[in-house]
């Protein structure tokens, strides 16, 4: 049986009474966002809107993005990535559990020095996936060119974010490449492994 979204008590600023709100609303009030599912257009639109709102409220305060995601849509993920780079607020990214594929890309896109992971996190990078359905050969060729273009763009960005060479990123992402939190730190995907909120 599904659990649903938990509710928690929250006192609005200036109010003497508490009310029950969903946990994500409460976390958002503390500038905490959570990517806890596959990246798709819906979650991307929600995260983009929340980042834009929080940045417009106070761009001097960081936004915390917790990630436990198997990855997902490249185009949806790039919408999140572009917004992370667009806002003035620092983006503190924190891996809790798994950051794979686009999840790992977004983890490493946080503000340099503020890309974090909990000790038992797993990070996985690989090349973008593309599907081939029963279509005309010319359509498949067009899609293949686009996938290769996206792969090159993602590899260049990841090389820049990690400090690794483009050639190393290209080689390592040829297949699923899993790293522990400590290995991800040494690789340059994150900056620190943390065990307590005060370390973020």
UniProtKB/Swiss-Prot annotation:
**Source organism per UniProt:** Prochlorococcus marinus (strain NATL2A)
Q: Where is the active site?
A: 101 (nucleophile), 126
The protein in question is named ATP-dependent Clp protease proteolytic subunit 2
- Molecular function as annotated in GO: ATP-dependent peptidase activity; ATPase binding; serine-type endopeptidase activity
What is the protein's known function? Cleaves peptides in various proteins in a process that requires ATP hydrolysis. Has a chymotrypsin-like activity. Plays a major role in the degradation of misfolded proteins.
Task: Report the EC code(s) recorded for this entry.
Answer: 3.4.21.92
What keywords would UniProt list here?
Cytoplasm, Hydrolase, Protease, Serine protease
Q: Where is the signal peptide?
A: none
Question: Gene3D superfamilies, per this entry?
Answer: 2-enoyl-CoA Hydratase, Chain A, domain 1 (3.90.226.10)
Its BP terms in the Gene Ontology are: protein quality control for misfolded or incompletely synthesized proteins
InterPro entries hit by this protein: ClpP, ClpP/crotonase-like_dom_sf, ClpP/TepA, ClpP_His_AS, ClpP_Ser_AS
Matching entries from NCBIfam families are given as: PRK00277.1 (NF001368), PRK12553.1 (NF009205)
Q: Which family does it belong to?
A: Belongs to the peptidase S14 family.
Q: How does it assemble?
A: Fourteen ClpP subunits assemble into 2 heptameric rings which stack back to back to give a disk-like structure with a central cavity, resembling the structure of eukaryotic proteasomes.
Origin: domain of life? Bacteria
Spell out the GO cellular component terms annotated for this protein, sorted alphabetically and separated by semicolons. Answer: cytoplasm; endopeptidase Clp complex
Catalytic activities: Hydrolysis of proteins to small peptides in the presence of ATP and magnesium. alpha-casein is the usual test substrate. In the absence of ATP, only oligopeptides shorter than five residues are hydrolyzed (such as succinyl-Leu-Tyr-|-NHMec, and Leu-Tyr-Leu-|-Tyr-Trp, in which cleavage of the -Tyr-|-Leu- and -Tyr-|-Trp bonds also occurs)
Location comes to: Cytoplasm
Q: Where would one find coiled-coil regions in this protein?
A: none
